[in-house]
């Protein structure tokens, strides 16, 4: 299977009154993919709206939950968009939060394979943290999306995926050099995610202790969520690329006073997109 080329960096959008205009600006800035987080996908046609608001950039879900949308709905979305905007939709899939998740995932992928037209493996990515989901991402999708991992764990995932699969890092970050403030912003989503069995197990595999996980220690926060000025964040992103990531999603966290996604995207664009064919002249 040929690798899915998403370019160097994309941005996670937040649905708002202005998000379609933001999508168009991000494409003009040269970002090579646009991402809609699962919590923002209250309707699959949000992805359609982003594609219509832009001209050529790939638009990806991160992720469509198997617990929320049946395979038939994803297949219908793909068929509609492939007819009108071929090659632009990337289906990032995740879950399910139920017993025997691998069995459910394989069944869901089987349905996408049998759809008319099928949603091809080359246009599917799978949220994966553990060994078996990474293997499934390698064998039945174009690759994996990973959230809240270290560069060392990224390197280990690359070894499992091999060289022909795409590895996307959904990178939470905070553009703020104040350590106390930045860490508190980072801890807000971590308080919820650290309570989910899959993330807790993933943190343990990265050798974080129960005390680190329960208390969301500075060490855990600092290793999983880059924060600081633009140069510091760009350096941290470079570590993930050197570890084997193909594409970085800027998933910007802020407390309302810190820079938001568009401010961060504008500030980081020059360094992250240098040399990218999609970069604006």
Question: Which residues fall in each region the model found?
Answer:
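Active-site-adjacent structural elements that line small-molecule/cofactor binding pockets in enzymes
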Residues: 1-281
């Amino acid at each position: 299977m040929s690798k899915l080329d998403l370019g160097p960096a994309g941005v996670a959008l937040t649905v708002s009154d202005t998000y379609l205009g933001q999508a168009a600006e991000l494409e003009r800035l040269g970002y090579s993919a646009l991402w809609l987080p699962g919590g923002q996908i209250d309707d699959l046609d949000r992805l359609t709206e982003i594609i219509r608001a832009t001209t050529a950039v790939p638009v990806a879900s991160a992720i469509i939950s198997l617990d929320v949308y049946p395979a038939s709905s994803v297949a219908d979305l793909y068929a509609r968009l492939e007819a009108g905007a071929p090659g632009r939709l990337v289906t990032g899939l995740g879950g399910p939060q139920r017993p025997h998740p691998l069995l459910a995932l394989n069944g869901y992928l089987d349905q996408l394979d049998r759809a008319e037209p099928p949603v091809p493996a080359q246009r599917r990515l799978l949220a994966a943290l553990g060994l078996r989901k990474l293997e499934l991402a390698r064998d039945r999708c174009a690759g994996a999306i990973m959230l809240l991992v270290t560069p060392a764990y990224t390197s280990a995932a690359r070894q499992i995926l091999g060289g022909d699969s795409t590895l996307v890092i959904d990178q939470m970050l905070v553009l703020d050099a104040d350590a106390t403030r930045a860490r508190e912003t980072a801890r807000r989503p971590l308080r919820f995610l650290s309570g989910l069995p899959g993330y807790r197990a993933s943190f343990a595999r990265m050798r974080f202790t129960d005390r680190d996980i329960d208390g969301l220690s500075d060490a855990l926060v600092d290793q999983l969520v880059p924060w600081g000025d633009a140069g510091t964040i760009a350096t941290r992103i470079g570590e993930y690329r050197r570890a084997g990531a193909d594409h970085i999603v800027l998933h910007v966290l802020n407390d309302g006073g810190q820079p938001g996604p568009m401010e961060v995207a504008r500030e980081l664009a020059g360094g992250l997109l240098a040399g990218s064919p999609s970069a604006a002249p």
